[in-house]
Every structure is written in C-alpha cells, then in structure tokens.
C-alpha cells in the first residue's frame, strides 16, 4: 500500500491554545497514555468522559495525559507529529482519516486485538466495516451518528411556515429574514463540516465524490458525463441561491461547524443540518434548545433523500510504545458503561440507545446514509471546501466550480496512487 511521505507542518502556535492535559505523570508502576480528543469543552460528553478516565486510571494504575483539539487542528498536528516520530498513543478521529492515515502507515493494525476483544459483538457489521480497510481493523469506534435537519419549532410557528422538506421550500422563503429578524438556515463553508455537507447535497442527486472503478481504484467522472456535471452544477447553484435569496447569512461563506452549531444552539438561526451531539446543548442552552425537533434533510424535488453517516474511530498510532494500554483505553471508551455515560444518544454499540428524539429520530434516517469512499481524503476535503469558495467568494459559476472540483478530486487521487486510469 502506498506510503505517503509527510513533510513537517508548523503548528506549534496552535498547541499553546489547547486545554491543559488532564494528567502529566504516570502513577507508580503504570504507563502514561497520551490521548488526543476533540470533544466540546464544558459539555456533557467531556464531563462524563473525564470521570470515566479517572476511573480507568484508578483501575489500571495508568495515567492519561489528555489534550483537546478541534478536528482540523488535530489533523494538522498529527501530520507534524508523525513526520517527527513523536506521536501520541491514542487519538480521536473522523471517518475521513481512515484511508489517509492507513496509506501513510501511521496507525496500528488492531485486527488481532479486536478479534480477541470480548465485547466486539456489541458492534454491528456496518460499524466494524467502517473501522476496516484492506481487511484490517484500524480503529475502535467511539461515536456514531447521522445528520438531520434540526428545527426550532417556535420560530417556524411564529413565521407561519411548515418545516421545509425540499430545496425549493427553503428557497421560497426569501422574505424570512426580513419578517423574522433571523436567517432560516445556514451551511458550513469551511473545515471538515463543509465537505460533509457538500457530500450529502451531491448524494441527493445520486452523485459520488469518487466512484469505485473496475480496477479497484477510484475516479470522479463528472467531467466525462454530461448528466453528472449538470447535477453537480445544480448543487453549487443551490449554495449561491441560498445567499442570493437571503436564506443564509452572507457571512456563512467564512463559517465552519463552530459557528453554525453555536448559531443554532443559541437561537440565532432557525434550522440547521447537524448531528445529535447538540443534545448536549439542551443543558447548556435550555432557553433556546427547548423547542427543537428532528426532520429529514431537505432535498431537491428532482433528487432523493440522503444524509451523512459518521462512525468515528479512535486510532492507536503505529509509533506508540503503549499499544496494549492504549487498546484497553480505547475499548473502555467503547464499553457499555462509558457509552451510556457519555454517548448514549449516539453510540456505535447496538445495546446503547435512548428513547429521546436525539436517538430514535436520528436513527430513523440511517437508511439514507452515505459515507466518503475509503481513499486519502485530505486533498479531496480541501478541494471540496475550495470549490464552495469558488462560487461564494471568487465569483465562479456553479458549472465552473463543479468542473474544477472533478479535476481536483482526480488530481488528489493521482497524487496518492488511487486514481483509476
């Protein structure tokens, strides 16, 4: 498998902004496990997980040195750490990292340990498959969710409108902002959330960002297929129409998930496509999160329903000297006790769920879930973000952006030895 040579990226300035580690020295006779997480600081998942980490430390005699990052910052920092040969033991990750990190050779093969893990039967085949590449298990899941269209019901009731079911329903509300003093919805245009949202809108027209070919490699075929290019053009035009019709804030072109989730949780916007981790905001923002309902993501009238399915892996780094202890901590994260405490509404385990809307209403959308292909995605993700910017910031036409993205995806695949010729 192709091994990517990673050049060092200077991110030292980022580290100074991170949360201080939980622990800094090992207990007598124990190991120190370097853990990198990406939870929302101060939210329920962090609070419950800190308690569970302390319990694990007491039970094992090991110490966890935990540092928190955003996913984007973690991704950049792990590339630097891998290039320098100074990696942590265990990190949170996203599905987009599976192919990239595996191709780079920086994550451990957990297949043997996983097969011996007594709790593995609590995971469905689809979850295990999401942790697997080339028939090797390289991750332990800690969270699974799909995306849904969250709605502040009181806002829509006041506005006298029904929950939008289609793109056309959204675009018809061009007077919503003027009448209600807030925007109807929003989109992420930067960071990992932007490419995830774009993937869904493409899937609603039956499009893939890269399709498997007969030789086992991948290719974006839009520029070779007039119908596909026309559909991709419609997707980028949708972004522009949202701005032009004042459905979303003009400033959204510079926003990532941090701004969009915050805006919805605090009632600044009336609807948003996001995940059920926002259940945590019911306790931190009770005044604005009490009227939220869960709906399918609006789709084009000439398209089909789709959502993003995300099963997040924990990776043990190949360079770790504490793989056994890191595996024990990773499987502790995935244990029924820990999942019920910290991830009850979004657990990858089949025996952990709740009766809340955050669990059952999201799960009802899973049949329309789509995922990224198992290829190196860092270049593709950035190209997807850049393609949105070409429309919303650079003034390119929707067709120009779609055609450019098709070429950019194939260029990334070629760079990583994954392009079907």
Regions found by a protein language model. Give the residues of each.
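Hinge/lid segment of periplasmic solute-binding proteins
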Residues: 95-148, 171, 177, 197-204, ...
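Conserved C-terminal helix/tail region of periplasmic/extracytoplasmic solute-binding proteins
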Residues: 63-64, 157, 340, 367-421
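C-terminal lobe and pocket-closing loops
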Residues: 274-289, 300-387, 420
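Extracytoplasmic/periplasmic substrate-binding proteins
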Residues: 38, 45, 52, 200, ...
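Short, solvent-exposed loop/beta-turn-alpha elements that line the ligand-binding surface or hinge
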Residues: 109-123, 207-234, 284-287, 299-307, ...
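Short, well-ordered beta-strand elements
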Residues: 29-41, 62-67, 89-90, 138, ...
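Extracytoplasmic "Venus flytrap"/periplasmic binding protein-like
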Residues: 28, 51-123, 154-165, 262-266, ...
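Glycine-centered hinge/linker elements that transmit conformational signals in sensory
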Residues: 174-178, 218-252
């Amino acid at each position: 498998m192709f091994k990517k040579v990673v050049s060092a990226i200077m991110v030292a300035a980022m580290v100074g902004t991170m949360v201080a580690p939980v622990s800094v020295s090992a207990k007598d006779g124990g190991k120190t496990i370097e853990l990198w997480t990406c939870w929302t600081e101060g939210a329920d998942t962090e609070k419950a997980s800190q308690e569970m980490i302390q319990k694990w430390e007491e039970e094992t005699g090991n110490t966890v040195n935990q540092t928190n990052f955003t996913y984007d910052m973690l991704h950049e920092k792990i590339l630097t750490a891998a290039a320098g040969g100074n990696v942590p033991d265990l990190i949170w990750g996203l599905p987009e990292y599976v192919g990239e990190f595996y191709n780079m050779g920086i994550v451990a093969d957990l297949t043997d340990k996983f097969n011996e893990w007594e709790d593995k039967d609590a995971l469905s085949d689809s979850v295990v498959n999401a942790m697997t590449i080339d028939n090797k298990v390289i991750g332990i899941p800690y969270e699974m969710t799909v995306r849904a269209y969250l709605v502040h019901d009181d806002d829509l009731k006041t506005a006298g409108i029904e929950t939008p079911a289609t793109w056309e329903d959204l675009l018809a509300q061009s007077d919503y902002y003027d009448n209600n003093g807030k925007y109807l919805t929003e989109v992420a245009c930067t960071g990992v959330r932007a490419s995830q949202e774009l993937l869904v809108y493409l899937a609603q027209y039956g499009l893939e960002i890269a399709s498997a070919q007969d030789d086992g490699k991948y290719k974006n075929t839009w520029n070779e297929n007039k119908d596909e290019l026309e559909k991709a053009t419609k997707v980028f035009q949708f972004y522009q129409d949202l701005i032009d019709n004042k459905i979303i804030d003009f400033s959204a072109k510079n926003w990532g998930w941090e701004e969009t989730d915050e805006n919805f949780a605090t009632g600044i916007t009336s609807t948003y496509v996001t995940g059920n981790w926002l259940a945590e905001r019911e306790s931190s923002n009770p005044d604005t999160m009490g009227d939220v309902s869960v709906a399918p993501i609006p789709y084009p009238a000439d398209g089909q329903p789709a959502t993003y399915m995300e099963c997040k892996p924990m990776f043990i780094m190949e360079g770790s000297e504490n793989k056994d202890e890191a595996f024990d901590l990773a499987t502790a994260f995935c244990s029924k006790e820990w999942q019920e405490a910290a991830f009850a509404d979004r657990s990858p385990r089949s025996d952990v769920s709740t009766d809340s809307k955050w669990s059952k209403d999201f799960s009802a959308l899973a049949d329309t879930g789509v995922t990224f292909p198992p290829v190196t995605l860092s270049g593709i993700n950035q190209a997807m973000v850049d393609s949105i910017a070409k429309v919303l910031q650079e003034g390119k036409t929707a067709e120009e952006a779609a055609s450019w993205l098709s070429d950019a995806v194939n260029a990334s695949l070629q760079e990583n030895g994954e392009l079907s010729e």
